[in-house]
């Protein structure tokens, strides 16, 4: 089976006894932001391996400037715990700091915190390739604190009330499932939208080649106009249970914040899927993009710039699929010679408009069971 990234399994989990004991201790507390809430969980369960906690100054600047951790392992996105200058002074050098959710619930702890100053302009230019406040990621970072505290973390997963532990499987569990099913190859597929026929077509091409498909939708922090996670989950359930062989796919949600960092985020997503145990990962057109900030294939091309041994997981590059009325089937530009006038293409805006008006979506665009879930949601608004 594929190794964890950095060849290091990470599991920084508190037992219920340790958690209860921690509750009674009188350490300083630090409330984490929404993004940090999900990052903290993923650090603790080992999906950000080899990281064992929030980045220190060396890892932060190395990630931005070298595209690696200070240890030399490939890394693309800074995972930091942002604080004000006043908080940085307060927490720096302490033995432990208790990390809490916005409502005050204890999530875990930060050990031996060390404070350092961030460079937000450098960060947005490196991570997002722009400093335009029109980019949601840039806008977010520039509005945040300029300091960070680094340190190893430990978490108590049941305290993360926003995360469904029955659906957000730990990497040890997914690896166990892949092994029990004798999958030698597993291809990961990420989405933050309902799966329509185009995605289904690409996934089924992948299933003709690989032993297993890991469907891993992102359900952490997304943009305000994205379809809510619970509605998307009903769509995935309707599709997978009716149209996929049950022994060929594994479904789990990924409670990660969406950064809209295009190419760098595609690398981040590939590392997470390697930690889950995937041997391959599908990167489609404009993966993790937003607006027109990235070229359609930049997120695929970035993988060609790394040394061959930088990642064990292999990238599967797909173009957009569509229904061609002339071919009478799903296709991509690689297999269809006909012009766009023969391709069924519905924008997200058009789909939402049709659903709100109760109009049926074409079966060539989406399965009727998925359309029904979406129709009920939009008519309830």
From Swiss-Prot:
The reaction(s) this protein catalyses: sulfate + ATP + H(+) = adenosine 5'-phosphosulfate + diphosphate
E.C. code: 2.7.7.4
InterPro entries assigned: ATP-Sase_PUA-like_dom, PUA-like_sf, Rossmann-like_a/b/a_fold, SO4_adenylyltransferase_pro, Sulfurylase_cat_dom, Sulphate_adenylyltransferase
Pathway noted in the entry: Sulfur metabolism; hydrogen sulfide biosynthesis; sulfite from sulfate: step 1/3
GO molecular function, one term: sulfate adenylyltransferase (ATP) activity
GO biological process: hydrogen sulfide biosynthetic process; sulfate assimilation
Enzyme class: transferase
Keyword Transcription regulation: no
UniProt entry keywords in alphabetical sequence: ATP-binding, Nucleotide-binding, Nucleotidyltransferase, Transferase
One Pfam family recorded for the sequence: PUA_2
Keyword rRNA-binding: no
Cross-referenced Gene3D superfamilies: HUPs, Sulfate adenylyltransferase
UniProt cross-references to PANTHER family, sorted A to Z: PTHR43509, SULFATE ADENYLYLTRANSFERASE
Protein family: Belongs to the sulfate adenylyltransferase family.
Listed name of the protein: Sulfate adenylyltransferase
């Amino acid at each position: 089976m594929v190794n964890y990234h950095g060849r290091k399994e990470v599991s920084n989990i508190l037992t219920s006894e340790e958690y209860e004991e921690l509750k009674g201790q009188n350490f300083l507390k630090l409330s984490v932001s929404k993004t940090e809430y999900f990052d903290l969980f993923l650090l603790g369960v080992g999906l950000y391996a080899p990281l064992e906690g929030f980045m220190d100054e060396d890892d932060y600047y190395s990630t931005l400037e070298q595209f690696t951790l200070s240890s030399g392992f490939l890394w693309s996105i800074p995972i930091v715990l942002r604080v004000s200058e006043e908080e940085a002074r307060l927490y720096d050098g302490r033995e432990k700091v208790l990390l809490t959710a916005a409502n005050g619930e204890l999530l875990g702890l930060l050990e031996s915190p060390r404070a350092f100053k961030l460079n937000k302009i450098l960060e947005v230019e490196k991570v997002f390739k722009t400093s335009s406040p029109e980019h949601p990621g840039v806008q977010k970072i520039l509005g945040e604190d300029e300091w960070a505290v680094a340190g190893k973390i430990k978490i108590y997963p049941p305290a993360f009330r926003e995360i469904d532990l029955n659906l957000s499987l730990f990497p040890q569990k997914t690896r166990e499932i892949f092994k029990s099913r004798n999958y030698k190859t597993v291809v990961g597929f990420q989405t933050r939208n309902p799966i329509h026929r185009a995605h289904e077509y690409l996934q089924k091409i992948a299933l003709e080649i690989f032993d297993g498909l890991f469907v891993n939708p992102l359900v952490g922090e997304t943009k305000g106009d994205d379809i809510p996670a619970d509605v998307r989950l009903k769509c995935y359930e309707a599709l997978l249970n009716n149209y996929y062989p049950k022994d060929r796919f594994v479904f789990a949600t990924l409670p990660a914040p969406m950064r809209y960092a295009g190419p760098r985020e595609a690398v981040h997503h590939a590392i997470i899927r390697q930690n889950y145990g995937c041997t391959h990962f599908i990167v489609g057109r404009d993966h993790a993009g937003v607006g027109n900030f990235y070229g359609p294939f930049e997120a695929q091309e970035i993988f060609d710039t790394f040394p061959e041994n930088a990642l064990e997981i292999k990238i599967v590059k797909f173009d957009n699929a569509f229904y061609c009325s002339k071919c009478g089937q799903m296709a991509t530009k690689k297999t269809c010679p006909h012009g766009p006038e023969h391709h069924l293409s519905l924008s997200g805006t058009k789909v939402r408009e049709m659903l709100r008006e109760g109009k049926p979506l074409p079966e060539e665009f989406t399965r009727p069971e998925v359309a029904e879930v979406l129709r009920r949601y939009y008519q309830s608004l």
